[in-house]
Amino acid sequence: YENRRKYLDDSPISVVAVLNNADMREEHDIAVERYEQRADELNIDIDVRENITSADLARVFESRNDLVHFIGHSDEQGLECADGFLSIESVSESNTQTFFLNACGSYHEGVGLVRKGSVAGGVTFEAVTDSQAAEVGTTFARLMVLGYSLERALDKARQQVMTPKDYAVVGDGTHVLTQSDAGIPPTHRLVDDGDGYTLKVDQLAPWNKGGEAGEQFDHQEHEYHLNAQHRSYNFSRAELLNAIDIFENPVVYDGTLHWPDELANLL
């Protein structure tokens, strides 16, 4: 929590995507695409690095960055690099605000970054398959730029795989990197009632208790409400499809996280 004070300026958001495993290029390319989607709107600077050395990776963490998304491998020696491994113990200090170490067993390296100055980050406990890592990594990237906190972004992202407990947040999981258009990004849960649908909305956030959040279900202006759990809205199928057409955020339907375009094809 104390590390937040290091990152209170209003400079452009700097994102560094590091690919140190060529087999995971698909995750890397999609993640970069997700960060680029709101780059102009949010003033995000994106730096792409590939197959870098341990010294170069150390400089990435020591430099002022808002998010480092590392894609590769790790073991007890540290994060794998082109010339060996980087142990975070050898990093003088971390000036990287947040991070996602999408590498097998990256927990200890993540804890090390928080101890050396980062606010929070996503890590893994055990070995994860490349396909699982890609699914979690790309979903995490998309949620972060939509304004979700690290904990909520990783929680939703790991719901996409069979072994969600392999992922966790170290540091302050309530930390937010970008601002949502709705003030607080909503959690949408959709229930099929047979003759229609019920959409349940949760927009609580620990930093905005007693505040307001916006919702938009058609092409009109946002409606603003005091933060509260379990607001419910009833829709016909046609009304729901119209609402989904302008959604940016995912919807949990039948126990699975769906993006709006995917959900529209299921209804």
Spans of model-derived segments:
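A domain-level signal for caspase-like cysteine endopeptidase catalytic cores
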Residues: 1-67
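A generic structural motif
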Residues: 44-52, 124-129, 154-155
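Caspase-like cysteine protease fold
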Residues: 85, 148-267
